[in-house]
């Protein structure tokens, strides 16, 4: 059985934990940003959310879409689609004993790409900014998966 103190002393695992915390915090901020834009623009997706602004027919005018709210919401969904695989594969990769400098480079590239992707999505910056940052992050996750499968799972 693995001694938990050894895992907590491992440089790669602690780097992964640090970068995972950063990227999860960023993803949580996207939830807050979505709520902020919904409240300030009075745009809601569910009838029960409109109660504070009116009743009956008056409340229905707040059930609409808004370009800004939708942009933030799509950026958040994109985070969910990319960060969750990174967390799973990154955890397994960090526990597989990779070279520390290579592993930390993977983690930094992913976090940097996802932060830039959010900036490119919300600003919005012209393409291919968002696409390039997406593919960098996706490529990092694929690279970790490949290295993990090749070195530890004997494929």
UniProtKB/Swiss-Prot annotation:
One of its GO terms (biological process) is cellular response to lipid hydroperoxide. The keyword Protease does not apply. It is an enzyme of class 2 (transferase). It is found in: Endoplasmic reticulum membrane; Mitochondrion outer membrane. Residues 3-9, 97-99, 149-155 are lumenal. The chain crosses the membrane at residues 10-33, 63-96, 100-123, 129-148. Pfam families: MAPEG. The modification N6-acetyllysine is found at residues 42, 55, 60. Keywords: Acetylation, Endoplasmic reticulum, Membrane, Mitochondrion, Mitochondrion outer membrane, Transferase, Transmembrane, Transmembrane helix. InterPro entries: MAPEG-like_dom_sf, Membr-assoc_MAPEG, MGST1-like. GO terms for molecular function: glutathione peroxidase activity; glutathione transferase activity. It is a multi-pass membrane protein. Glutathione binds at residues 38, 73-74, 76, 81, 121. Its EC number is 2.5.1.18. It comes from the Eukaryota. Residues 34-62, 124-128 are cytoplasmic. Highly expressed in liver. The keyword Metal-binding does not apply. Its main location: endoplasmic reticulum. GO terms for cellular component: azurophil granule membrane; endoplasmic reticulum; endoplasmic reticulum membrane; membrane; mitochondrial outer membrane; mitochondrion; peroxisomal membrane; plasma membrane. It catalyses: RX + glutathione = an S-substituted glutathione + a halide anion + H(+). Homotrimer; The trimer binds only one molecule of glutathione. Belongs to the MAPEG family. Conjugation of reduced glutathione to a wide number of exogenous and endogenous hydrophobic electrophiles. This is Microsomal glutathione S-transferase 1.
């Amino acid at each position: 059985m693995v001694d938990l103190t050894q895992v907590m002393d491992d440089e790669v695992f602690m780097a992964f934990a640090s970068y995972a915390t950063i990227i999860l915090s960023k993803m949580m901020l996207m939830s807050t940003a979505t709520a902020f834009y919904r409240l300030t623009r009075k745009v809601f997706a569910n009838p029960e959310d409109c109660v504070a602004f009116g009743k009956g027919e008056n409340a229905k005018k707040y059930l609409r879409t808004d370009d800004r709210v939708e942009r933030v919401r799509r950026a958040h969904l994109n985070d969910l689609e990319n960060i969750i695989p990174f967390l799973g594969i990154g955890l397994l990769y960090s526990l597989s004993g990779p070279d520390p400098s290579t592993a930390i480079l993977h983690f930094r590239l992913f976090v940097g790409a996802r932060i830039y992707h959010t900036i490119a999505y919300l600003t919005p910056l012209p393409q291919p900014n968002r696409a390039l940052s997406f593919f960098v992050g996706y490529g990092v996750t694929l690279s970790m998966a490949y290295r993990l499968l090749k070195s530890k799972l004997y494929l």
